[in-house]
Amino acid sequence: PPPPLFFHADDGIRDRSPSGGLGDVYKRHRLFMDSLCLLSDGVPEVMEFDWEATVKLGLPTGQGFGMSAAGSVSFCNSIQRAIGIPYEEGHRRSLMIAHLVDRKRSSGLGDVTALSAGGVEIRKIPGSPFSGHLLENGPGKSEGWTAEAEIILAWKGEGGKHTSSYIDNPEWRGLISSAGSKNLEELSHKNWNESRWSDIILSSRKFSVESGLSSEKSRSEVLRMCEEAMLEGGMSHSGVALLCMLGTSVAIVPNSLESGLVEVNQVRSLLDDCGLENILTRIGDV
């Protein structure tokens, strides 16, 4: 049997959105227990200890932000560092485990592959970024680049459908896979760098429509609220609202990386007024 695991999961916004219940706690506990059990396959000595872990996430899970993958990676990194495993070896193993957990729980669509690249990422080959006992590269492969640009993330506090409700549904899976493959192919033809920003925005919009995801009432409502806040706040010319997949959430990104977003505080205040949780962040490092 696995060792006792006591944990506290803090999504970083719990004081603003007290919507988490016992079901959320149970799901998170299973996430970390699954991670620990898979970790023990490669590092059996972790089973010799009782563990108490505090996992702090800056965003909610289940909203298309990749927090399940990020939480699993952080958890496995911490456990391995605690028993003296070198960082690079441990981090590779953590990414591999997080990918396996996402597959098992149907909780991600390439989130871990994206995390391994960082920044604005494109997945070239699906699969775990590292594999096998030697933690060699692949089969998954992704590329990323970064830029100095602020982004607003906005979401409904009560959360949306779990990713598994789409991945495990043959009709949804077919629509998402078809739209994703088509738009990914169009993005893969040229070099992956900052010059592709307008292509990314266009493909994101096309994917949300072609997959049918933007037609769901909960998503279209959040998108409408964001676009209205941008118009009223004076941001409609500098930014664009894009759906996050597969949450009930939106990323407000700049039309131009050089110019960035304007009237950020005003728009965030309007998002607060209409009941949307939101946070100001930026494009990540690679």
Where are these regions (language model features)?
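Glycine-rich, charge-dense phosphate/pyrophosphate-binding loop(s)
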Residues: W192-V286
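A short secondary-structure junction signal
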Residues: I125-P126, G132-E136, H162-D168
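Glycine-rich, flexible beta-strand/loop modules in the N-terminal catalytic cores of phosphate-handling
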Residues: S19, G23-P44
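Short, small-residue-biased leader/transition segments that mark boundaries at the very start
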Residues: P2, D10-Y26
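Acyltransferase
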Residues: G140-S203, F207-E210
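Gly/Ser-rich oxyanion-binding loop with an adjacent helix/lid
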Residues: E45-H133
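Solvent-exposed alpha-helices and their adjacent loops that cap or buttress functional pockets
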Residues: R105-S107, T113-L115, S142-E148, G233-S236, ...
